[in-house]
Amino acid sequence: MTKLHFDTAEPVKITLPNGLTYEQPTGLFINNKFMKAQDGKTYPVEDPSTENTVCEVSSATTEDVEYAIECADRAFHDTEWATQDPRERGRLLSKLADELESQIDLVSSIEALDNGKTLALARGDVTIAINCLRDAAAYADKVNGRTINTGDGYMNFTTLEPIGVCGQIIPWNFPIMMLAWKIAPALAMGNVCILKPAAVTPLNALYFASLCKKVGIPAGVVNIVPGPGRTVGAALTNDPRIRKLAFTGSTEVGKSVAVDSSESNLKKITLELGGKSAHLVFDDANIKKTLPNLVNGIFKNAGQICSSGSRIYVQEGIYDELLAAFKAYLETEIKVGNPFDKANFQGAITNRQQFDTIMNYIDIGKKEGAKILTGGEKVGDKGYFIRPTVFYDVNEDMRIVKEEIFGPVVTVAKFKTLEEGVEMANSSEFGLGSGIETESLSTGLKVAKMLKAGTVWINTYNDFDSRVPFGGVKQSGYGREMGEEVYHAYTEVKAVRIKL
């Protein structure tokens, strides 16, 4: 093993805006220890609702990541983790789910502080994370191979075997939920993990690591290494000891991840990338029921969801009526502000860079000639808050229609026929999510079959369940998170053929 010397990183006591206090780990979590980075460097973590520094956490170096990979590799090859009765892994995952659930108030509050989303939304994210762990616990001993009858004097069967060391890179929009999406199935199938949280939202990943140790996850099985993508991410994608890599983030970075993973050792990879999803509203839609779905589709999590329904297409028969109702609903029902205030639907944008990007796109939309129905401005003097923004009378050549904004900004256009609406929806190079609003089940199912997207929501939107697979087509990536499908992504198939 590499001869490196690490100092213990001490936790810091944090008092959250709702009065809860806790000990926040600040070090790299490697081999069940919280350590300072090899070079001792740290970086500040910001509360996006106030722009104040919460604490400093260690920033991993390439040497730190290599050490984490060595520890994970040892845990996989030199311990019984991968070969033990899978029910034992299920038992530990169940304990981890119980521990997370027992601390749901605290973990939700950490998420709201670190990410800027509302406390209610954060609690929903933690609930999904808990469900992912429970699903993984149940699946641990139930994802198996099969026998194959060839009728020729042979016995044939397959086994599903763990891949090995898995690199996992998650974004800042759903820190705890994305962590569970990736770690839970990997562990259930007998793999070991090195997870890189987004640099701007590392707090819950590090706190989760402390829970892993508490419930008895063996050393080296889970490692958390915060730091910049150019250092930590590059080390994971380029190291040949990483056999599987799961990445959620932008399409641009995802393409680089695919190239590096291929050139290093043809890693098995899952990519969940960007989106510019369409939300179709047909003439027969119930407008009262549709409005909350449109809001959840684009303004949930301040629009920072890769599957956000950021292009709304409304059939011409109800276009004017829906625009008026949408404007009234947003201006009277949707409040923006302090994530810990229960009255607010939308919290802060997670970081300054993304805030500036969104405001720039709003300026671009104005210059392109799109009309603003409502919103378009910053909220308050402190924190990264943007009012929900709706552009209408847009055309398909506008940048605000074609490019992912990743914020509370939506475009609205009209269509005449079902076929025209589907054509407009499918015109994007992305294909992550899509939505349909209609009172006709036959219309919904017909259009769902025609849409080029990994997920189609009918009369709902951005409505996730850990038992349902999620992923994209086209430039939104490949592979699936959640559902039974994700467990197969963390195994290799071995065929055995015996001559009788």
Swiss-Prot record:
GO BP, one annotated term: acetate biosynthetic process
Regulation: The activity is stimulated two- to fourfold by divalent cations but is unaffected by K(+) ions.
Active site (catalytic residues): E272, C306
InterPro entries reported for this sequence: Ald_DH/histidinol_DH (IPR016161), Ald_DH_C (IPR016163), Ald_DH_CS_GLU (IPR029510), Ald_DH_N (IPR016162), Aldehyde_DH_dom (IPR015590)
Keywords recorded for this protein, A-Z: Cytoplasm, Isopeptide bond, Magnesium, NADP, Oxidoreductase, Ubl conjugation
Uppermost EC category: oxidoreductase
Binding residues for NAD(+): G249, S250, T251, E252, V253, G254
PROSITE patterns in alphabetical order: ALDEHYDE_DEHYDR_GLU (PS00687)
Record pathway: Alcohol metabolism; ethanol degradation; acetate from ethanol: step 2/2
Annotated GO CC locations: cytosol; mitochondrion
Gene3D superfamilies: Aldehyde Dehydrogenase, Chain A, domain 1, Aldehyde Dehydrogenase, Chain A, domain 2
Catalytic reaction equation(s): acetaldehyde + NADP(+) + H2O = acetate + NADPH + 2 H(+); propanal + NADP(+) + H2O = propanoate + NADPH + 2 H(+); propanal + NAD(+) + H2O = propanoate + NADH + 2 H(+)
Enzyme Commission (EC) number: 1.2.1.-, 1.2.1.4
Family affiliation: Belongs to the aldehyde dehydrogenase family.
PANTHER family documented for this protein: ALDEHYDE DEHYDROGENASE-RELATED
Protein name (database record): Magnesium-activated aldehyde dehydrogenase, cytosolic
Species this chain originates from: Saccharomyces cerevisiae (strain ATCC 204508 / S288c)
Gene (name only): ALD6
